[in-house]
Amino acid sequence: MAKKGNRIQVILECTEHKTSGVPGTSRYITTKNKKNTPDRLEIKKFNPILKRVTVHKEIK
């Protein structure tokens, strides 16, 4: 039987969008290796609704 992989799919959500009051959310889907990065990801990505680069954090 095949071994389960270390790569999992995670969802990144904008943290600044909640406080701005603008409707909608900015989310990205990516993969991460849970052995190399066991803690939650925090990456700067482009938010098309706010039209600027913001911090996106991993959600569960």
UniProtKB/Swiss-Prot annotation:
- Cysteines paired by S-S bonds: none
Entry keyword Protease? no
| Gene Ontology cellular-component terms listed | cytoplasm; ribonucleoprotein complex; ribosome
User: Gene3D superfamilies under this entry?
Assistant: Ribosomal protein L33 (2.20.28.120)
Sorted alphabetically, which InterPro entries does this protein's record hold? Ribosomal_bL33, Ribosomal_bL33_sf, Ribosomal_zn-bd
- UniProt keyword annotations, A-Z: Ribonucleoprotein, Ribosomal protein
One MF annotation (Gene Ontology) recorded for this entry: structural constituent of ribosome
Similarity remark:
Belongs to the bacterial ribosomal protein bL33 family.
Protein name (record) = Large ribosomal subunit protein bL33
